[in-house]
Amino acid sequence: MKILLLILIAYLLGSIQTGLWIGKVFFHTNLREHGSGNTGTTNTFRVLGKTAGTITFLVDMLKGTLAVLLPIWLGVTEVSPLIIGFFAIIGHVFPFFTGFKGGKAVATSAGVLLGFVPLYFVFLLLVFALTLYLTSMISFSSITAAVVGLITLATFPAIHFLLDGYDPIFSAVLIIIALVIIFRHTENIARIRNHRENLVPFGLNLTKQNPNK
Protein backbone atom coordinates (compact mmCIF):
# COMPACT_ATOMS: atom_id res chain seq x y z
CA MET A 1 0.00 0.00 0.00
CA LYS A 2 2.86 2.37 0.83
CA ILE A 3 4.47 1.70 -2.53
CA LEU A 4 1.27 2.47 -4.43
CA LEU A 5 0.83 5.66 -2.42
CA LEU A 6 4.41 6.73 -3.19
CA ILE A 7 3.87 6.02 -6.90
CA LEU A 8 0.70 8.13 -6.88
CA ILE A 9 2.39 10.99 -5.03
CA ALA A 10 5.36 10.91 -7.40
CA TYR A 11 3.11 10.91 -10.46
CA LEU A 12 0.99 13.80 -9.18
CA LEU A 13 4.13 15.69 -8.19
CA GLY A 14 5.51 15.24 -11.68
CA SER A 15 2.19 16.30 -13.18
CA ILE A 16 2.59 19.85 -11.86
CA GLN A 17 3.54 21.87 -14.97
CA THR A 18 5.56 24.64 -13.37
CA GLY A 19 6.10 26.78 -16.46
CA LEU A 20 2.46 26.60 -17.47
CA TRP A 21 1.21 27.78 -14.07
CA ILE A 22 3.85 30.49 -13.71
CA GLY A 23 2.82 31.80 -17.11
CA LYS A 24 -0.89 31.80 -16.30
CA VAL A 25 -0.66 33.19 -12.75
CA PHE A 26 2.11 35.79 -13.05
CA PHE A 27 2.22 36.66 -16.75
CA HIS A 28 -1.36 35.91 -17.88
CA THR A 29 0.24 33.93 -20.69
CA ASN A 30 -0.52 30.40 -21.82
CA LEU A 31 2.79 28.81 -22.80
CA ARG A 32 0.96 26.38 -25.06
CA GLU A 33 0.07 29.30 -27.32
CA HIS A 34 3.56 30.78 -27.58
CA GLY A 35 7.00 29.71 -28.78
CA SER A 36 7.24 25.97 -29.26
CA GLY A 37 4.05 25.41 -27.27
CA ASN A 38 5.96 23.27 -24.76
CA THR A 39 5.54 23.89 -21.02
CA GLY A 40 9.11 23.02 -20.04
CA THR A 41 12.16 25.06 -19.11
CA THR A 42 13.39 26.01 -22.58
CA ASN A 43 10.12 27.49 -23.81
CA THR A 44 9.58 29.21 -20.46
CA PHE A 45 12.98 30.91 -20.82
CA ARG A 46 12.13 31.91 -24.38
CA VAL A 47 8.63 33.26 -23.70
CA LEU A 48 8.63 34.42 -20.07
CA GLY A 49 12.28 35.31 -19.45
CA LYS A 50 15.25 34.24 -17.36
CA THR A 51 13.65 34.44 -13.91
CA ALA A 52 10.59 32.37 -14.85
CA GLY A 53 12.77 29.93 -16.78
CA THR A 54 15.18 29.45 -13.90
CA ILE A 55 12.37 28.90 -11.39
CA THR A 56 10.72 26.42 -13.76
CA PHE A 57 13.95 24.46 -14.16
CA LEU A 58 14.62 24.32 -10.41
CA VAL A 59 11.07 23.31 -9.48
CA ASP A 60 10.84 20.70 -12.25
CA MET A 61 14.17 19.26 -11.16
CA LEU A 62 13.12 19.29 -7.51
CA LYS A 63 10.06 17.19 -8.41
CA GLY A 64 12.34 14.35 -9.46
CA THR A 65 14.63 14.72 -6.46
CA LEU A 66 11.76 14.72 -3.97
CA ALA A 67 10.21 11.65 -5.59
CA VAL A 68 13.48 9.74 -5.18
CA LEU A 69 13.99 10.86 -1.59
CA LEU A 70 10.43 10.15 -0.38
CA PRO A 71 10.84 6.35 0.03
CA ILE A 72 14.22 6.92 1.71
CA TRP A 73 12.77 9.39 4.19
CA LEU A 74 9.80 7.12 4.91
CA GLY A 75 11.95 4.02 5.31
CA VAL A 76 10.34 2.14 2.43
CA THR A 77 12.88 -0.45 1.30
CA GLU A 78 10.69 -2.79 -0.76
CA VAL A 79 11.13 -0.71 -3.93
CA SER A 80 14.06 1.14 -5.49
CA PRO A 81 13.79 4.93 -5.11
CA LEU A 82 14.54 5.09 -8.84
CA ILE A 83 11.22 3.43 -9.60
CA ILE A 84 9.38 6.08 -7.60
CA GLY A 85 11.42 8.80 -9.29
CA PHE A 86 10.55 7.37 -12.68
CA PHE A 87 6.85 7.91 -12.00
CA ALA A 88 7.57 11.60 -11.40
CA ILE A 89 9.09 11.66 -14.90
CA ILE A 90 5.99 9.93 -16.29
CA GLY A 91 3.86 12.55 -14.55
CA HIS A 92 5.91 15.36 -16.08
CA VAL A 93 5.60 13.93 -19.61
CA PHE A 94 1.95 12.85 -19.27
CA PRO A 95 0.47 15.17 -16.61
CA PHE A 96 -2.99 14.42 -15.28
CA PHE A 97 -3.70 18.10 -14.57
CA THR A 98 -3.18 19.32 -18.15
CA GLY A 99 -4.65 16.67 -20.40
CA PHE A 100 -1.60 14.38 -20.39
CA LYS A 101 0.41 16.86 -22.51
CA GLY A 102 3.60 17.78 -20.69
CA GLY A 103 7.29 18.58 -21.01
CA LYS A 104 10.30 16.73 -22.36
CA ALA A 105 11.45 15.21 -19.06
CA VAL A 106 14.95 16.71 -18.99
CA ALA A 107 14.80 18.72 -15.75
CA THR A 108 12.79 16.11 -13.83
CA SER A 109 15.11 13.33 -15.02
CA ALA A 110 18.06 15.40 -13.86
CA GLY A 111 16.40 15.73 -10.46
CA VAL A 112 15.96 11.97 -10.21
CA LEU A 113 19.68 11.44 -10.87
CA LEU A 114 20.60 14.20 -8.42
CA GLY A 115 18.66 12.46 -5.67
CA PHE A 116 19.96 8.96 -6.42
CA VAL A 117 23.49 9.33 -7.88
CA PRO A 118 24.69 12.92 -7.28
CA LEU A 119 28.18 12.43 -8.76
CA TYR A 120 26.72 10.94 -11.92
CA PHE A 121 24.33 13.89 -12.12
CA VAL A 122 27.29 16.29 -11.95
CA PHE A 123 29.09 14.31 -14.67
CA LEU A 124 26.13 14.49 -17.06
CA LEU A 125 25.56 18.14 -16.14
CA LEU A 126 29.11 18.91 -17.26
CA VAL A 127 28.47 17.03 -20.51
CA PHE A 128 25.31 19.10 -21.00
CA ALA A 129 27.06 22.40 -20.22
CA LEU A 130 30.01 21.72 -22.54
CA THR A 131 27.71 20.68 -25.39
CA LEU A 132 25.55 23.75 -24.82
CA TYR A 133 28.59 26.02 -25.07
CA LEU A 134 29.74 24.34 -28.29
CA THR A 135 26.36 24.16 -30.04
CA SER A 136 24.17 26.85 -28.41
CA MET A 137 21.29 24.33 -28.45
CA ILE A 138 19.54 23.16 -25.29
CA SER A 139 17.79 20.39 -27.22
CA PHE A 140 20.99 18.94 -28.68
CA SER A 141 22.71 19.22 -25.29
CA SER A 142 19.87 17.30 -23.64
CA ILE A 143 20.00 14.57 -26.29
CA THR A 144 23.80 14.36 -25.98
CA ALA A 145 23.61 13.94 -22.20
CA ALA A 146 21.02 11.18 -22.69
CA VAL A 147 23.21 9.37 -25.23
CA VAL A 148 26.29 9.70 -23.02
CA GLY A 149 24.21 8.23 -20.20
CA LEU A 150 23.52 5.19 -22.38
CA ILE A 151 27.17 4.86 -23.40
CA THR A 152 28.37 4.94 -19.80
CA LEU A 153 26.26 1.90 -19.01
CA ALA A 154 28.55 -0.08 -21.31
CA THR A 155 31.63 1.29 -19.55
CA PHE A 156 30.36 0.86 -15.99
CA PRO A 157 33.59 -0.71 -14.60
CA ALA A 158 35.49 2.42 -15.63
CA ILE A 159 33.06 4.86 -13.96
CA HIS A 160 31.86 2.87 -10.95
CA PHE A 161 33.03 5.67 -8.64
CA LEU A 162 30.31 7.88 -10.15
CA LEU A 163 27.58 5.31 -9.57
CA ASP A 164 27.69 4.61 -5.86
CA GLY A 165 23.94 3.94 -5.96
CA TYR A 166 24.17 1.48 -8.84
CA ASP A 167 22.01 -1.63 -8.93
CA PRO A 168 20.52 -3.66 -11.82
CA ILE A 169 17.41 -1.49 -11.80
CA PHE A 170 19.59 1.53 -12.48
CA SER A 171 20.45 0.29 -15.98
CA ALA A 172 16.83 -0.37 -16.91
CA VAL A 173 15.57 2.96 -15.59
CA LEU A 174 18.42 4.95 -17.14
CA ILE A 175 17.83 3.35 -20.54
CA ILE A 176 14.12 4.20 -20.38
CA ILE A 177 14.80 7.77 -19.22
CA ALA A 178 17.31 8.33 -22.03
CA LEU A 179 14.94 6.94 -24.66
CA VAL A 180 12.07 9.08 -23.36
CA ILE A 181 14.22 12.22 -23.58
CA ILE A 182 15.38 11.38 -27.11
CA PHE A 183 11.85 10.52 -28.27
CA ARG A 184 10.44 13.75 -26.81
CA HIS A 185 12.96 15.70 -28.89
CA THR A 186 11.90 14.22 -32.25
CA GLU A 187 10.77 17.60 -33.62
CA ASN A 188 13.99 19.22 -32.40
CA ILE A 189 16.06 16.56 -34.17
CA ALA A 190 14.25 17.36 -37.43
CA ARG A 191 14.98 21.09 -37.01
CA ILE A 192 18.63 20.38 -36.17
CA ARG A 193 19.01 18.34 -39.36
CA ASN A 194 17.56 21.27 -41.31
CA HIS A 195 19.81 23.77 -39.44
CA ARG A 196 16.77 25.61 -38.09
CA GLU A 197 16.84 24.77 -34.38
CA ASN A 198 16.29 27.49 -31.79
CA LEU A 199 19.43 28.77 -30.07
CA VAL A 200 20.40 30.29 -26.75
CA PRO A 201 22.09 33.73 -27.01
CA PHE A 202 25.57 32.42 -26.18
CA GLY A 203 27.98 29.71 -27.22
CA LEU A 204 29.75 28.86 -30.48
CA ASN A 205 26.87 27.45 -32.58
CA LEU A 206 29.31 25.07 -34.27
CA THR A 207 26.59 23.44 -36.37
CA LYS A 208 25.59 26.84 -37.83
CA GLN A 209 21.90 26.69 -36.96
CA ASN A 210 19.75 29.54 -38.25
CA PRO A 211 16.18 29.34 -36.91
CA ASN A 212 15.15 32.45 -38.88
CA LYS A 213 16.03 31.19 -42.36
From Swiss-Prot:
Domain of life: Bacteria
Predominant subcellular localization, coarse grouping: membrane
UniProt catalytic activity: an acyl phosphate + sn-glycerol 3-phosphate = a 1-acyl-sn-glycero-3-phosphate + phosphate
Keywords: Cell membrane, Lipid biosynthesis, Lipid metabolism, Membrane, Phospholipid biosynthesis, Phospholipid metabolism, Transferase, Transmembrane, Transmembrane helix
InterPro entries referenced in this protein's UniProt entry, alphabetically: G3P_acylTferase_PlsY
Subcellular location field: Cell membrane
GO biological process: phospholipid biosynthetic process
MF annotations from Gene Ontology: acyl-phosphate glycerol-3-phosphate acyltransferase activity
Any GO CC annotation of this UniProt entry: plasma membrane
Function: Catalyzes the transfer of an acyl group from acyl-phosphate (acyl-PO(4)) to glycerol-3-phosphate (G3P) to form lysophosphatidic acid (LPA). This enzyme utilizes acyl-phosphate as fatty acyl donor, but not acyl-CoA or acyl-ACP.
Description of how the protein assembles with itself and partners: Probably interacts with PlsX.
UniProt cross-references to PANTHER family, sorted A to Z: GLYCEROL-3-PHOSPHATE ACYLTRANSFERASE-RELATED, INNER MEMBRANE PROTEIN YGIH
Protein's recorded name: Glycerol-3-phosphate acyltransferase
Organism of origin: Streptococcus thermophilus (strain ATCC BAA-250 / LMG 18311)
Lineage: Bacteria, Bacillati, Bacillota, Bacilli, Lactobacillales
